[in-house]
UniProtKB/Swiss-Prot annotation:
Belongs to the histidinol dehydrogenase family. The gene is hisD. It comes from Synechocystis sp. (strain ATCC 27184 / PCC 6803 / Kazusa). This is Histidinol dehydrogenase. Its cofactor is Zn(2+). It holds the Pfam family Histidinol_dh.
Length: 434
């Protein structure tokens, strides 16, 4: 049942539980994920197939784990033209947004006479993208991950996505993968998929980085694999905050609260407001809109709103903003009287969506901003997926003779103080050698 919680009445323990979302259950998931990872690490393909046959499809073999060219061709024939046009529209906007993020491949600046410093930007050689499916098909997620990787110039893009029980990958996702420049798609889900691309097997390519949203078990696996491969931003179960005030239409507040709530029973969706009247009205409309959803989506909403979300009533707009910055939501929708005025007061959110015409669903599919965002409070230190997740930076420096002369005394003084004689010797001897 959806709750109205009064922020000032919550005990420290209750507030902490609210801020932890479903991550409070991760300890059990860690034990399960560790067992799967160890088996894949030790047995390679055999370990992957053991779990794939249990959780993906019973007929999994080393030969059919990778999507074939024939399967890509078949998928092309199955996609409805209207759906293809929608995917192409989303692709264009996502590509434009991420192309605009690209830095120059190299820059050097003269910071004092003869002293040049800068960076060289290089794409990662290989990345593994995890595109979930458990609660539905997500071709949009394929775009959000693969397009910035391709724009960044990654040489090899590998995707793992769960198949259906017949061993088929959803056709729109395959068409989208080709559109976005994916090189390999494997019919793998869950912890076994992440372990396979982290360690590599005879069949599955090893990658330099893996990235993508996961269930709580996938989030646990990423923690365990973080010493083996770069696991990117923490992207677990969906979460959102809708910020409202007394001017907000309660129908919009109720509608937008359900957007992230329908992702799953482990999703955390909160309506945060200092208006008791708005809170009560929105709660009433929630029941009405829940009845418009399929039973299984309705249950996801009811479970998540009852366990990890609901309506949070604060004492003031400032108290709402303070809570938001502390909670650091994945998605933040601002439905207040003047949303632009509040942007400068919001420090911690994966995405900030402003105004009545910008629901989270529009950002998920069509605006072009990336919808793969940090969860679990990690928006305090992580950002949305971008081209920068697929690029690495090498510092670049060059000294002319004049520049060397200008810094040599500083270098030798500091090297002597820190007792690194070889550092200082490399400077002093150069005066005799050059």
């Amino acid at each position: 049942m959806t709750r109205i919680l009064k922020l000032s009445h919550l005990t420290p323990q209750q507030l902490n539980q609210l801020k932890r979302r479903s991550e409070q259950n991760i300890d059990q998931a860690l034990a399960i994920a560790k067992e799967v990872i160890e088996q894949v690490k030790m047995e390679g393909d055999a370990g992957v197939l053991h779990y794939s046959r249990q959780f993906d499809f019973a007929g999994a073999t080393a030969e059919n784990l990778r999507v074939s060219e024939a399967e890509f061709a078949e998928a092309e024939k199955l996609v409805d033209p209207e759906l293809r046009r929608a995917v192409e529209h989303a692709f264009r906007n996502i590509e434009k947004v991420h192309a605009g993020q690209m830095p120059p491949p190299m820059h050097l600046a003269e910071i004092e006479p003869g002293v040049f410093a800068g960076e060289k930007i290089t794409p990662l050689p290989t990345v593994g993208l995890y595109v979930p499916r458990g609660k539905g098909a997500f071709p949009s997620m394929m775009l959000m991950l693969a397009v910035p990787a391709r724009v960044a110039g990654v040489k090899k893009i590998v995707v793992c996505t769960p198949p259906d029980k017949e061993g088929k990958v959803e056709p729109v996702s395959l068409v989208t993968a080709r559109m976005a420049g994916v090189d390999e798609v494997y019919k793998l889900g869950g912890v076994q998929a992440l372990a396979a691309i982290a360690y590599g097997t005879k069949t599955v390519s090893k990658v330099d980085k893996l990235i993508g949203p996961c269930s709580i078990y996938g989030a646990a696996a990423k923690r365990l694999l973080s010493g083996i491969v770069d696991v990117g931003l923490p992207a677990g179960p969906s979460e959102s905050i809708v910020l409202a005030d007394e001017t907000t239409d309660p129908k919009l507040a109720a509608l937008d609260l359900l957007i992230e709530a329908e992702h799953g029973s482990d999703s955390a969706a909160l309506l945060v407001t200092h208006s008791a009247s708005l809170a009560e009205k929105a709660l009433g409309y929630l029941g009405e809109y829940l009845e418009k959803l399929p039973p299984w989506r309705k249950k996801f909403c009811e479970d998540g709103l009852g366990s990890y979300g609901g309506i949070l009533l604060t004492d003031s707009l400032q108290a709402s903003l303070d809570f938001i910055n502390d909670y650091a939501p994945e998605h933040l929708q601002v439905l207040t009287a003047d949303p632009l005025k509040l942007v400068g007061k919001i420090d911690n959110a994966g995405e900030i969506l402003l105004g009545n015409y910008t629901p989270s669903s529009a950002a998920t599919y069509a605006i072009g901003v990336n919808a793969v965002l940090p969860t679990g409070g990690f928006a305090r230190s992580y950002s949305a997926v971008s081209v920068f997740d697929f690029l690495k930076r090498s510092t670049l420096a060059y000294l002319t003779e004049e520049g060397f002369a200008g810094v040599k005394e500083t270098v030798t003084t500091l090297a002597d103080y820190e007792d690194f004689p070889a550092h200082a010797l490399a400077i002093r001897e150069r005066e005799n050698l050059l």
